[in-house]
Amino acid sequence: MPPKPRNGYLPTAAANTMSQPQTPLRALLLHGIHMHAWVMLPLAWQLRRHNIHSRCFGYYSIAQTLPQHSRRLAEAVRRHYQQHQEPLHFICHSLGGLVLRRFAADYPELVRGRSVTLATPHLGSETANRLHRYAPALIGGAYQNGLDGNLPP
């Protein structure tokens, strides 16, 4: 008999056999453009249930440039995680993934874990190109060397 859907999803064998890590993992969550750190809280709460301690890093997505976000992220990582020996993982949505890429290029010594980017425009964004052309204030500092696709590898 096939498994029954639960909450709209089919259970997988991996989900049934996954064990929680013995020592808590640490993760830093980065939000996308025009968002606030609190939008990542539901994900942080779910991660906590699986013994992953996380913080939500907030930044002014369009008021500053990616290098400025990268610098602030480096300050936060040094302040909150430098004393820990275990890896720090990153989970990023949209522009947050571009901030992480810039951070990894600028501060490779601070990247000691894995990264997941969700809906990040790694190759640039056609929508951002149009907005930059017709309403540049809507994307501000996030465009140049970020949403335009000109980012370090």
Set out the residue ranges of the language-model regions.
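Serine-dependent carboxylesterase/thioesterase catalytic core
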Residues: A27-W38, R48-Y60, Q64-P153
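Alpha/beta-hydrolase fold catalytic core
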Residues: M1-L25, L41, W45-I52
